[in-house]
UniProtKB/Swiss-Prot annotation:
Name of the gene: tolB
Oligomeric and partner information: The Tol-Pal system is composed of five core proteins: the inner membrane proteins TolA, TolQ and TolR, the periplasmic protein TolB and the outer membrane protein Pal. They form a network linking the inner and outer membranes and the peptidoglycan layer.
Protein's name in the database: Tol-Pal system protein TolB
Function, in words: Part of the Tol-Pal system, which plays a role in outer membrane invagination during cell division and is important for maintaining outer membrane integrity. TolB occupies a key intermediary position in the Tol-Pal system because it communicates directly with both membrane-embedded components, Pal in the outer membrane and TolA in the inner membrane.
Originating organism: Salmonella typhimurium (strain LT2 / SGSC1412 / ATCC 700720)
Coiled-coil spans in chain: none
């Protein structure tokens, strides 16, 4: 926990002021069919009101995963603070087989102890499936809640939790000196801060695999340029600023390379930079347009969008040579893919019959499932555990962020209050 807090603290060193206009998750579909679970408000052992609702954070995280449906607080049969106080029959009568309880205790030095227990209501009374405690300062109470959520989620599903991750996105506001902002927030929209403000468009943020940097496209020099910004100190490295288009950056999973698209020779083609030496290699060639690269887990293979067959489709190619292979065949066109961290599936923008939605394709069987039902969906980005996708869509005269689970059951919206939100990128584990 201490190491995790040190890593996360680096994000706050540069931005002391957190924005007040934030995005918040609004669930639109899918919770009722999820697994029921009990999350009891954590007992506050100090004077006055609790500084943070840790139980509420855990319940929201589990609900936002799409896999759990926490029992409403008004229906809780009891409010125990420890496993020993849990009455299994009271919970099992409501179909609840697991309950999260906990306490928050203030320390004399101003810090807090946060403790939780995950209790099995189907076993002997007091049976604990998982438990932990953390000592944190006030600003890390939400992080402690997300940590508990990660551990509970993994214990119950066998899947690593992704509640301590962040999202990067571009916000376009109306007017002002800097109408374009690259922002980062917790995955649930809290703790939002500005990475970069610009009078010109910002596009295509992409995370480094260690979560310490963002690559993105800026037009501040009068033409497009690719840059990499270190989040802890704000240092910016220019990667490419060739004539015409520079765009679509993507870090390799091993962190040694950056793929991107350039049109300096005419058509859009893919290039890969060795980040240590700065050497750039051209990967694709020809008259077709090749763009939107995403890496397979081996850090040697790219999936990308190409119009070599007429309409945009997704292809894959080894960066060390060989012919590109088309991998999408359903729908009139497919583009802007994001490959899962295990390489078993990808999500993409799929168009058919005039509709443009987010779809998931199994990379073994080729099977395709349409996940979203919003309007003009684009720029999908997978959570690092592969359970959720964040993407942007059109709503009214603007754009908003949306979440959908990769099984298609759970859907949510992250509306912003101060502008159009687009180009989301989900961070790696932090």
């Amino acid at each position: 926990m201490k190491q995790a807090l040190r890593v996360a603290f680096g994000f706050l060193m540069l931005w002391a002021a957190v924005l007040h206009a934030e995005v918040r998750i609004e669930i639109t579909q899918g919770v009722d069919s999820a697994r029921p679970i009990g999350v009891v408000p954590f007992k506050w052992a100090g004077p006055g009101a609790a500084p943070e609702d840790i139980g509420g954070i855990v319940a929201a995280d589990l609900r936002n995963s799409g896999k759990f449906n926490p029992l409403d607080r008004s229906r809780l049969p009891q409010q125990p603070a420890t496993a020993q106080e849990v009455q299994p029959t009271a919970w099992s009568a409501l179909g609840i087989d697991a309950v999260v309880v906990g306490q928050v205790t203030p320390n004399p030095d101003g810090s807090y102890n946060v403790a939780y227990q995950l209790v099995d209501t189907g076993g002997a009374p007091g049976t604990v499936l998982a438990q932990n405690s953390y000592k944190v300062n006030k600003q890390w109470l939400r992080y402690a809640g997300h940590t508990a959520s990660d551990e509970v989620f993994e214990k119950l599903t066998g899947i690593k939790g992704a509640f301590r991750t962040r999202i990067a996105y571009v916000v376009q506001t109306n007017g002002g000196q800097f109408p374009y902002e690259l922002r980062v927030s917790d995955y649930d929209g809290y703790n939002q801060f500005v990475v970069h403000r610009s009078p010109q468009p910002l596009m295509s943020p992409a995370w480094s695999p260690d979560g310490s940097k963002l690559a993105y496209v800026t037009f501040e020099s009068g033409r497009s340029a690719l840059v990499i910004q270190t989040l802890a100190n704000g240092a910016v490295r220019q990667v490419a600023s060739f004539p015409r288009h520079n765009g679509a950056p993507a870090f390799s999973p091993d962190g040694t390379k950056l793929a991107f698209a350039l049109s300096k020779t005419g058509s859009l083609n893919l290039y890969v930079m060795d980040l240590a030496s700065g050497q750039i290699r051209q990967i694709t060639d020809g008259r077709s347009n090749n763009t939107e690269p995403t890496w397979f887990p081996d850090s040697q293979t790219l999936a990308f969008t190409s119009d070599q067959a007429g309409r945009p489709q997704v292809y894959k190619m080894n960066i060390n040579g060989g012919a590109a292979q088309r991998i999408t065949w359903e729908g009139s066109q497919n583009q802007d893919a994001d490959v899962s961290s295990d390489g078993k599936f990808m999500v993409m923008v799929s168009s058919n019959n005039g509709q443009q939605h987010i779809a998931k394709q199994d990379l073994v069987t080729g099977g395709v499932q349409v996940l979203s039902s919003t309007f003009l969906d684009e720029t999908p980005s997978l959570a690092p555990n592969g359970t959720m996708v964040i993407y942007s869509s059109s709503q009214g005269m603007g754009s908003v962020l949306n979440l959908v689970s990769t099984d298609g059951r759970f859907k949510a919206r992250l509306p912003a209050t101060d502008g159009q939100v687009k180009s989301p990128a989900w961070s790696p584990y932090l």
